[in-house]
Amino acid sequence: MKTKSIFPLFLLAGTLLTAACATPTAKQAGNNSLEWGQVPQQPDLSWADSVGSRQMPGNHVILSANSFGAVADSTVLSTEAIQKAIDSCAVIGGGTVVLQPGYYQTGALFIKSGVNLQLDKGVTLLASPSIHHYPEFRSRIAGIEMTWPAAVINIVNEKNASVSGEGTLDCRGKVFWDKYWEMRKEYEAKGLRWIVDYDCKRVRGILIERSSDITLKGFTLMRTGFGDVRFFTPIIAR
């Protein structure tokens, strides 16, 4: 089946949408009116039907992370237990990892090929505010390859993986934004504004890198510490 890189398509979509959002006329801008005139013609996005993941993990095996020790307690770190469930699911050929309703604190999780992490309604993953719970590895930050903390959810060098459901991924990123703005004040005073973006290490929400047929569906992603969903290197999809 012919494949395409969705990264250039994202850029094309952004260009089309920007072009469609016409700026107000001088008359409109001058009277501070909320009337923006005629609605601009919407761009043709029919091409979007031909891109995206070609499949979701199909194995019907369901593993509960609670059986591996995950605890619905926001004060208890359940990273290891949830990761064990994901890894075990991948070993047996893939399937779905679920959690009982509740709040689970977690550090970096790595979704494997063939695995669907299902966040059902009533399930909330609370990202740990400690940067030490996110191991560092080589990644791309604002166009530069460097060592950076893992995201809360990572899908790297994998195929046919997904995160789905009606639950919530709360990244609780305020601690990282507070750190950034404090460092930025110091760096700006030294004329080094641009460097703070690389020196202030923060945790991203979701990282997808060098992977294919990845699905993110249904769940709520909120309060990220640095970027919501990041795609790096072309992601191959139909």
Task: Name each region found by the language model.
Residues 217-221, 228:
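Active-site pocket-lining segments that scaffold enzyme catalytic pockets across diverse folds
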Residues 2-8, 16, 21-98, 103-116, ...:
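Extracellular "leader-to-stem" segments immediately downstream of a signal peptide or signal-anchor
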Residues 230, 234, 238:
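Phosphate-binding glycine-rich loops and their immediate beta-loop-alpha structural context
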